[in-house]
């Protein structure tokens, strides 16, 4: 057995259900990714926030990554349970103070606010038109400034060449 000096308790990353999943499937999947732990023995279970009942969940295999391990677990809940808080409970020998790690998954708001599409579209169209006009104006302004600089350069060059030609006819300035 290899002992690591660093903190090797599980580091959680949580993933919440997508809006598309909750609308199409009428359910949501919470995913808990646990990384950088050692040794590989780990127990994971899920519960609702104020309940001790263990919920049915699934787990991936424990995978070795460099000198540590990673594992993921997921819980799929029906639409009616999405407004409840859920917990992923992780038991590992290197948890701080030997206490089970509790990862909280917030409730998912399933109500969607609808807006009048006519109001929103006309505002977006006006904003787009204004942005387009601003960009076009800026483009033509820079083009005009560039043209002015080229004309100015040509005039100065002609003046300097005439002066040089006039001065070089035997006269010294």
UniProtKB/Swiss-Prot annotation:
One of its GO terms (molecular function) is small molecule binding. PROSITE patterns: IG_LIKE. GO terms for biological process: adaptive immune response; gamma-delta T cell activation; T cell receptor signaling pathway. Its main location: membrane. Residues 10-104 form the Ig-like domain. The keyword Glycoprotein applies. InterPro entries: Ig-like_dom (IPR007110), Ig-like_dom_sf (IPR036179), Ig-like_fold (IPR013783), Ig_C1-set (IPR003597), TRG_var/const_region (IPR051117). Glycans are attached at residues 66, 120, 126, 135. Pfam families: C1-set. Constant region of T cell receptor (TR) gamma chain that participates in the antigen recognition. Gamma-delta TRs recognize a variety of self and foreign non-peptide antigens frequently expressed at the epithelial boundaries between the host and external environment, including endogenous lipids presented by MH-like protein CD1D and phosphoantigens presented by butyrophilin-like molecule BTN3A1. Upon antigen recognition induces rapid, innate-like immune responses involved in pathogen clearance and tissue repair. Gamma-delta TR is a heterodimer composed of a gamma and delta chain; disulfide-linked. The gamma-delta TR is associated with the transmembrane signaling CD3 coreceptor proteins following the stoichiometry: a single gamma-delta TR heterodimer associates with one CD3D-CD3E heterodimer, one CD3G-CD3E heterodimer and one CD247 homodimer forming a stable octameric structure. Upon activation, gamma-delta TR complex associates with FCER1G to initiate intracellular signaling. PANTHER family: T CELL RECEPTOR GAMMA CONSTANT 1-RELATED, T-CELL RECEPTOR GAMMA CHAIN. This is T cell receptor gamma constant 1. It comes from Homo sapiens. The gene is TRGC1.
């Amino acid at each position: 057995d290899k002992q690591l000096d660093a903190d090797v308790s599980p580091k959680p990353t949580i993933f919440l259900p997508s809006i598309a999943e909750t609308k199409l499937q009428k359910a949501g999947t919470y995913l808990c990714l646990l990384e950088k732990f050692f040794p590989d023995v780990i127990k994971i279970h899920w519960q609702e926030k104020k309940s001790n009942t263990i919920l049915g969940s699934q787990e991936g295999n424990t995978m070795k990554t460099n000198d540590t391990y990673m594992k993921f677990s997921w819980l799929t809940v029906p639409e009616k349970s999405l407004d409840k808080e859920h917990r992923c409970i992780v038991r590992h020998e290197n948890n701080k103070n030997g206490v089970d790690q509790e990862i909280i998954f917030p409730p998912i708001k399933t109500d969607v606010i609808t807006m009048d599409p006519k109001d929103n579209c006309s505002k977006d169209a006006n904003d787009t038109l204004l942005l387009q006009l601003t960009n076009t104006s800026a483009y033509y302004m820079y083009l005009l400034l560039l043209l002015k600089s080229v004309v100015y350069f040509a005039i100065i060059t002609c003046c300097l060449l005439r002066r040089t030609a006039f001065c070089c006819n035997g006269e010294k300035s």
